[in-house]
Curated annotation (Swiss-Prot):
It is found in: Membrane. This is Short-chain dehydrogenase/reductase phqE. GO terms for molecular function: oxidoreductase activity. It is an enzyme of class 1 (oxidoreductase). The keyword Protein biosynthesis does not apply. Its EC number is 1.1.-.-. Belongs to the short-chain dehydrogenases/reductases (SDR) family. Keywords: Alkaloid metabolism, Membrane, NADP, Oxidoreductase, Transmembrane, Transmembrane helix. NADP(+) binds at residues 23-24, 26, 46-47, 50, 76, 131, 203, 205. The lineage of its organism: Eukaryota, Fungi, Dikarya, Ascomycota, Pezizomycotina. The chain crosses the membrane at residues 25-45. Short-chain dehydrogenase/reductase; part of the gene cluster that mediates the biosynthesis of paraherquamide, a fungal indole alkaloid that belongs to a family of natural products containing a characteristic bicyclo[2.2.2]diazaoctane core. The first steps in the biosynthesis of paraherquamide is the production of the beta-methyl-proline precursor from L-isoleucine. They require oxidation of a terminally hydroxylated L-isoleucine to the corresponding aldehyde by enzymes which have still to be identified. Its cofactor is NADP(+). The gene is phqE.
Length: 265
């Protein structure tokens, strides 16, 4: 009788992982999880000091990791004039003399959207530079820096806002839906490379705290009441969805929801 194959736990060991938006929150947790699996990680962020601090935190958490396996690249994804060239620079640095295996994009404009009656053309378009234009520029250039095969992946980020919008978040909900639709198109255009989306629910990050301000405690209580598990999400838990999509070579065009059952209540 042929023995069953032994499950592998080292699938990401030595893989090159690029995390765009990796200085805090879910993105930082993805960086840490990837390093924990033995990956070589490149972090992209817009704030030089945050990048420096994030690298220091990761090196402290993984002291046995080769310092050269954690690389930081500054890139302002909100600037439409430079976003394409900045993204190509990040791809070049992440690839080094090899190829990138996985790209994760968690970057987003985390400022609270204005009320519907105060919307302007600029306030509607601005979040789209990071949420739509930047991923498309990544997709445009990644074939030069990745092997187009099922072992390679691009994972985008939407959110539960797509299916259950909160009042005042129409613009962001629209972009979340657009990201999911775009991912399916990219899964076709970039095949056999895999393209997927993670759609988080209420995840408590520093950026969320900053946005909510004094309303934070009430928002947490409301989110917990909406969840079937009775709690909000942590970046560390949600990061596992991104790791799964790197490992499952049969997942493409998929949306992985990690929202504590909030869509059921």
């Amino acid at each position: 009788m042929t023995p069953a194959p032994t499950p592998r736990t080292d699938q990401l060991h030595g893989s090159r992982v690029l995390v765009i938006g990796g200085t805090s929150g879910i993105g930082f947790a993805v960086c840490a999880a990837a390093l924990g699996h033995g990956a070589i990680v490149t972090i992209v962020g817009s704030n030089a000091q945050k990048l420096k601090d994030s690298v220091a935190r990761l090196k402290s958490s993984f002291p046995s990791t080769d310092p050269d396996d954690i690389v930081a690249v500054r890139c302002d994804l909100s600037n439409s004039d430079t976003v394409e060239q900045d993204i190509e620079k990040a791809l070049q640095l992440a690839a080094g003399n090899s190829k990138i295996n996985h790209i994760v994009i968690t970057a987003a404009d985390m400022t609270a959207p204005p009320p519907l009656e105060d919307l302007t053309v600029d306030s509607v378009q601005r979040p789209g530079i990071i949420r739509l234009v930047a991923p498309l520029m990544v997709a445009k250039h990644l074939p030069k820096y990745m092997n187009k095969c099922p072992q390679s992946s691009l994972t985008l980020t939407s959110g539960a806002h797509c299916l259950r919008p909160d009042p005042g978040w129409t613009v962001i909900s629209g972009y979340c839906g657009a990201v999911e639709a775009m991912s399916r198109g990219l899964a076709i255009d970039l095949k056999p490379l895999r393209v997927n989306v993670v759609a988080p629910g209420a995840v408590l990050t520093e950026a969320v705290k900053d946005i909510l301000g004094d309303a934070y405690d009430a928002a947490v209580e409301m989110a917990e009441a909406k969840s079937t598990v009775g709690q909000t999400g942590s970046p560390e838990s949600v990061a596992q969805a991104y790791i799964y999509l790197m490992k499952d070579h049969y997942a493409s065009g998929s949306v992985v929801s990690t929202n504590g059952g909030m869509l059921l209540v």
